[in-house]
Amino acid sequence: MKPGETYQLGQHRLACGDASDVALIKRLVDKDKVHVVLVDPPYSVAVVQSKQWLNPKSQHKTISNDGLVSDETYEAFTTTWLEAIKPHLAPRNSIYIFNSDKMLLPTVQALKASGGKFAQLLIWAKTQAVVGRLDYLPQHELIIYGWYGRHIFHKSKDKSILVYPKPNRSKQHPTMKPVGLLRRLILNSSSVSEVVYDGFVGSGSTLLACEQTNRRCLAIELDPEYCQTVISRWERLTGQKAEILP
């Protein structure tokens, strides 16, 4: 898959490009309205490089835009991609942004600055810690939850701490999320056939969660190799073939 191309994967669409590209998003979304934004953007923690000392032979690719940057730069980056998808949101919508402790404040500030509401902080509690250089090894990731305007929540009184095992280490992506966790968020905030947007789809876990819950995923990924991984995972799951769009 090449930059600028868009593929149809059953009821889903995948574009290779930048989540801040307004024209690309307009083509991808077309006349649809997005009910859920569920994204795992780069955290500005250089996740692959920071672990290179642990495993010098690691085959993981560097994540695009994951270099260490200032809070101000990261807030501007977040504001830009939020503003790009904002015109395509349904009147009732939900926003889920995975993030790290380090970039929590700039992300919340960007959500508020773009007119969004920061409602709650959810925690993905992993069953094992992530090895690294910090004094306290992280065993969690944060999920910023909010919306623009109004929202719908389908499950009464879910919990803010979401316990799911970290996926086994995979060559497909260094920060892969559990499909079960994504399914839970999608089911809480959308109905069958509604649209879920992921502008940083990585290896495609959000798209697979949409396939399993009968939602439509509109996805963007900057890295062509990860785009191909998304297509391969979906084709293996469904037995269908992705088709390039004109």
Can you name each region flagged by the protein language model?
Residues 3-4, 240-246:
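Short mixed-charge
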Residues 1-227:
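Core catalytic lobe of class I
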